[in-house]
């Protein structure tokens, strides 16, 4: 009984740490995507001020 309880407790701790890691990793991915979008928008805005060629700026900055 005691070993079953210890095993269950250990399993719960492992699962909680996996869930915690997954949530931190998901936040990291969201922030990476947000930074990428900000960079693309900034690149596009600067390019448009310089060249005014929308098609070229979309190609240059990777904006779809």
Curated annotation (Swiss-Prot):
What remark about domains does the record contain?
Has the structural arrangement of two alpha-helices stabilized by disulfide bonds (CSalpha/alpha 2(S-S)).
Stretch forming the signal peptide: 1-26
Q: Among its keywords, does the record have Disulfide bond?
A: yes
Assigned protein family: Belongs to the short scorpion toxin superfamily. Potassium channel inhibitor kappa-KTx family. Kappa-KTx 3 subfamily.
Secreted among keywords: yes
According to the UniProt record, one GO cellular component term is: extracellular region
| Organism placement in taxonomy | Eukaryota, Metazoa, Ecdysozoa, Arthropoda, Chelicerata
User: Per UniProt, which keywords does this protein have?
Assistant: Disulfide bond, Ion channel impairing toxin, Neurotoxin, Potassium channel impairing toxin, Secreted, Signal, Toxin, Voltage-gated potassium channel impairing toxin
Q: What is this protein called?
A: Potassium channel toxin kappa-KTx 3.4
Tissue expression summary: Expressed by the venom gland.
**Disulfide bridges in this chain:** 43-61, 47-57
The GO terms this record gives for MF are: potassium channel regulator activity; toxin activity
Q: Where in the cell is it found?
A: Secreted
Q: What does this protein do?
A: Potassium channel inhibitor (Kv).
Propeptide boundaries: 27-36
Q: Which domain of life is it from?
A: Eukaryota
């Amino acid at each position: 009984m005691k070993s079953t309880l210890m095993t269950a407790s250990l399993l719960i701790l492992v699962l909680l740490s996996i869930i915690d890691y997954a949530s931190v990793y998901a936040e990291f991915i969201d922030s990476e995507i947000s930074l990428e979008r900000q960079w693309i928008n900034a690149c596009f805005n600067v390019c448009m001020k310089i060249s005014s060629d929308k098609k070229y700026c979309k190609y240059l900055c990777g904006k779809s």
